[in-house]
Amino acid sequence: MPRPIRCRRVEFLPKFKYFSPAQGTSDEVTLKIEELEAIRLKDLEGLMQEECAQKMQVSRQTFQLILEEARKKIADALVHGKAIRIEGGNYVYGKCSYICLNCGKVFDSDYHECPECHSKDIGCTRGRGRCYCFGHGRR
């Protein structure tokens, strides 16, 4: 059984969610919210990959995979004249609060371990200890 996908933290939700070529097309690609966030952090903000991964609360490898997929979709749309729809994904908007499953302390998500007892056994308070935020970001 595969591991559940952790939510990716995003700090930006787009106002415009659909872009199409001047000559209408029925073909489109769907860019997930976390893919747009990866593009924003790396290409627009100019952050290093490690900083981007920390902001999104994913590993560097996962961040790289998200970024590659986003760039591939955007290139496909531009080269082949497809529309881009931005929606969906597994993400949480803003900051989650986390709880230490060892001592029960609730703290900000910027920590990777409990600031009280230094346990790494932590989870998102939205998921009752574990972060299974599937669809939290769907609007």
UniProtKB/Swiss-Prot annotation:
One Pfam family for this entry, by name? DUF134
InterPro entries reported for this sequence: RNA_pol_sigma_r3/r4-like, UPF0251, WH-like_DNA-bd_sf
**Signal peptide span per the entry?**
none
- Give the similarity note: Belongs to the UPF0251 family.
Q: What is this protein called?
A: UPF0251 protein Csac_0224
